Amino acid sequence: MENYDLYLPTHLIFGRGRIDELPSLLPAKGSRILLAMGGGSIRRISLYDKLRELLSDYEVFDFSGIEPNPKISTIRRAVDLCKAQKIDFIVAAGGGSVIDAVKCIAAGAYYDGDPWDLVLDHSRIGRAIPFCAVLTLSATGSDYDNSGVISNSATNEKMFLAASNSGSDLYLHGAGQSDSSRIGGHHLSHIRAVSR
């Protein structure tokens, strides 16, 4: 057995209806928020409408279409939107792929070059936009760590991203929106906060 240390400075808020606490975890009212999501599951389970209701005091910009094994081309579009709209905070709604993508988007928004550079060289990761995630499916554990997997169709690569150099930014992550691993089960919301 190998020796190791594990440090997860995690604040987990778990329980039925706890998603209503989301606004208390967000920046000041009027902040500019990117709502990042996948292919539509959050609309099918009415999570989108609930999030828009909870975010009604903020200027919200939707970014949908984050695919499984998120592509750097999708991340580039989201980074461009964050820069153009001066996004203050990101809410990731979906599964592990959405969270993985948002980790790269959050760091890419403060990076002057191509976000793929951050995947190739983790030491380039500096500041990042704080974010929270409301997880609809527990599967990958992306909501519990500072890493993810990003794909590049142009180079046929699937690479690991680690955001360990994110400084003192606050990351808010969420976990779980259903009682079961099946989307559409009884709703149970969780919101998790991780500070770095």
List each model region and its residues.
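N-terminal loops that bind phosphate or other acidic moieties
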Residues: A84, I105, H122
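Glycine/serine-rich anion-binding loops at beta->alpha junctions
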Residues: I87-I105, T136-S142
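Structural signal for hydrophobic packing residues in well-ordered secondary-structure cores
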Residues: L26, G30, L55, C82, ...
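Alpha-helix N-cap/helix-start motif
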Residues: R44-I45, A101-V102, S142-D143, G176
